């Protein structure tokens, strides 16, 4: 885990990273799993990087926003600092859908006063050398780039 390695270098044995991500996860799926995760780990910081799979499935942006808001609320209720990492989706569903999808992250971050990394795949998306054959998901070469993008947000939350 690159994040754990970076944290261990700067803060030896002070922070434990729990990667609770699930491949193909939607905001609804995460919402069902989050209460138990919060209870089990009692995290100081929760990074929410979800919604992309909802968007690829054409889920209503309002539903995605509602789920993101609930994920933030549940985390904040447990006294965790929340970071929201935004996503963008391919233009398959049209400009209006894409804009509504992307605005979800801004709205939720402003409403709940959480830090927003606007686009977690900035510098990765669209770069064929950093994306898997599905043209959506980042490959192993992209991971250090994504860590460098996310780390200032994570470090600031500690």
Which stretches of residues belong to each language-model region?
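Alpha-helical scaffolding within the catalytic cores
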Residues: 28-40, 62, 66-70
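Serine-esterase "nucleophile elbow" of acetyl-processing enzymes
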Residues: 1-23, 33-42
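Glycine-rich phosphate-binding loop signature in dinucleotide/nucleotide-binding domains
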Residues: 39-42, 78, 157
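Solvent-exposed loop/turn segments at secondary-structure junctions
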Residues: 22-28, 52-57, 63, 88-92, ...
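Structural recognition of the beta-strand scaffold that forms the well-ordered cores
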Residues: 16-21, 45-49, 82-86, 117-118
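Catalytic His-Asp segment of secreted/periplasmic serine-dependent ester chemistry enzymes
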Residues: 88-158
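Active-site segments of SGNH/GDSL-like serine hydrolases
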Residues: 49, 69-103
